[in-house]
């Protein structure tokens, strides 16, 4: 009876913080799934932007002054990154349009027409996508939101950010790298990915040593892991 009463009266509405947490958590799982199944780079961008919006209330869950500062930093830095990623996505579409090809963001079409894509626009698009999605991944030096967000959010939220949000952004970057490889621009992409990955690993290694907060240590560990992933695809293969 007690369980039925909770359901009838609306547990999520009577316990607002927990209700918001559960709703945002479910929204995050949905948007993360959309990122994984999307084969359209525009829809992929929308889904990654949605992950930012639904995870922000999770960082603010404790409702302290420090958590609201961390949330605003997460949003502002994330929005700058996602805006640059949008410009990069437009550049990929224009790389096809500039050569008289159909203007498309479907990954399969871009891969099929990759050799005919405009190389300058493709390179510009990849640079913007690397900076944009690299910000969401937390690659150094665009990682500034991570220590505060991980440190002030509940532990489970930090795990979701480390294992979910950053992985979604990495998937988007890997798909952009696929287009570069198909277009014969793998060397150009690797020249950007390798130093970025190494720098991220170095920064994380330097800053994690002085940390005493385990959640901030997780943040710098995530920076290092994202650097390893960038280094991995830069060395070869996506």
Predicted regions and their residues:
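Residue-level signature of transmembrane alpha-helical cores of multipass secondary-active transporters
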Residues: 68, 74-78, 125-132, 159
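Juxtamembrane/interfacial segments at transmembrane-helix boundaries in multi-pass membrane proteins
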Residues: 2-13, 84-145, 170-192, 238
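Hydrophobic core segments of alpha-helical transmembrane domains in multi-pass membrane transport
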Residues: 32, 88-90, 128-133, 197, ...
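Alpha-helical multi-pass transmembrane bundles of energy-transducing inner-membrane proteins
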Residues: 20-27, 33-121, 207-238
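Entry/N-cap segments of selected transmembrane alpha helices
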Residues: 14-18, 75, 79, 189-194
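Functional transmembrane alpha-helices
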Residues: 40-56, 137-177, 191-238
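Physicochemical signature of membrane-embedded alpha-helices that form the seven-helix bundle of GPCRs
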Residues: 24, 77, 128, 193-199
């Amino acid at each position: 009876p007690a369980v039925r009463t909770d359901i009838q009266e609306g547990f999520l509405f009577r316990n607002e913080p927990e209700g918001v947490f559960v709703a945002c958590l479910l929204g995050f799982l949905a948007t993360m799934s959309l990122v994984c199944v999307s084969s359209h780079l525009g829809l992929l961008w929308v889904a990654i932007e949605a992950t930012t919006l639904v995870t922000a209330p999770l960082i603010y869950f404790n409702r302290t002054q420090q958590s609201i500062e961390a949330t605003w930093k997460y949003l502002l830095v994330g929005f700058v990154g996602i805006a640059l990623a949008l410009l990069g996505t437009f550049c990929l579409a224009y790389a096809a349009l500039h050569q008289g090809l159909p203007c498309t963001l479907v990954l399969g079409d871009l891969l099929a027409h990759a050799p005919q894509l405009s190389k300058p626009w493709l390179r510009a698009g990849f640079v913007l996508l690397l900076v944009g999605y690299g910000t969401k991944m937390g690659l150094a030096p665009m990682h500034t939101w991570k220590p505060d967000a991980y440190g002030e959010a509940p532990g489970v939220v930090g795990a979701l950010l480390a294992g979910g949000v950053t992985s979604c952004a990495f998937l988007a970057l890997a798909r952009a790298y696929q287009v570069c490889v198909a277009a014969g621009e793998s060397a150009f992409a690797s020249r950007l990915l390798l130093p970025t990955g190494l720098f991220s690993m170095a920064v994380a290694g330097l800053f994690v040593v002085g940390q005493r907060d385990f959640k901030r240590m997780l943040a710098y560990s995530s920076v290092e892991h994202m650097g390893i992933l960038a280094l991995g695809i830069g060395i070869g293969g996506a």
